[in-house]
Amino acid sequence: MPLTDTPPSVPQKPRRGRPRGAPDASLAHQSLIRAGLEHLTEKGYSSVGVDEILKAARVPKGSFYHYFRNKADFGLALIEAYDTYFARLLDQAFLDGSLAPLARLRLFTRMAEEGMARHGFRRGCLVGNLGQEMGALPDDFRAALIGVLETWQRRTAQLFREAQACGELSADHDPDALAEAFWIGWEGAILRAKLELRPDPLHSFTRTFGRHFVTRTQE
């Protein structure tokens, strides 16, 4: 899922005293997080340096090391910030009581496509991007990324349980397995859409997943 709004900042963890000439502390922290998310959702972790983030955020180097020990520490903070941002995005779609459960899932995929379209399909999902780079990333990233994905899967599984309860989804489905399959496929569709700079892979995935629902519920 791409970055579509200004993400919330993670809790600040200052390391040293505020550097001279630094902007307001909270603004500097938010600027660093936002610049980091924008660059990493588009370019990935390995190809983006700290200096590039500092330039985009327009903060001095001292401000970066006031909050983060190093680039790896910054990367973990970005995962945390993205997780918080994404939880709110899922709330917006999954908690919409005016829609049936599966319609809420379709709302989420439409919101995701609209977010990618706003950036010309050049920004992808931070979690998916980092997962692709995991072989070159610090080991701490693995547990953080898996934890985020498992949270998304649990929330989606609950949505499928609601769909079963109202007769919208066949009871033959295992909600947990179906949620895992959804996120494996959706992350792949996001990656392909970013590669091709077009929404077609997203449409292909949602059509296929939707047909699976319809076929099973009509049996």
From Swiss-Prot:
<feature type="DNA-binding region" description="H-T-H motif">
    <location>
        <begin position="49"/>
        <end position="68"/>
    </location>
</feature>
<dbReference type="InterPro" id="IPR036271">
    <property type="entry name" value="Tet_transcr_reg_TetR-rel_C_sf"/>
</dbReference>
<keyword id="KW-0804">Transcription</keyword>
<dbReference type="GO" id="GO:0003677">
    <property type="term" value="F:DNA binding"/>
</dbReference>
<dbReference type="Pfam" id="PF00440">
    <property type="entry name" value="TetR_N"/>
</dbReference>
<keyword id="KW-0678">Repressor</keyword>
<dbReference type="InterPro" id="IPR009057">
    <property type="entry name" value="Homeodomain-like_sf"/>
</dbReference>
<keyword id="KW-0805">Transcription regulation</keyword>
<dbReference type="Pfam" id="PF16925">
    <property type="entry name" value="TetR_C_13"/>
</dbReference>
<dbReference type="InterPro" id="IPR011075">
    <property type="entry name" value="TetR_C"/>
</dbReference>
<protein>
    <recommendedName>
        <fullName>Transcriptional regulator AcuR</fullName>
    </recommendedName>
</protein>
<dbReference type="InterPro" id="IPR001647">
    <property type="entry name" value="HTH_TetR"/>
</dbReference>
<comment type="function">
    <text>A transcriptional repressor for its operon. Probably binds to 2 operator sequences in the promoter.</text>
</comment>
<feature type="domain" description="HTH tetR-type">
    <location>
        <begin position="26"/>
        <end position="86"/>
    </location>
</feature>
<keyword id="KW-0238">DNA-binding</keyword>
<feature type="region of interest" description="Disordered">
    <location>
        <begin position="1"/>
        <end position="25"/>
    </location>
</feature>
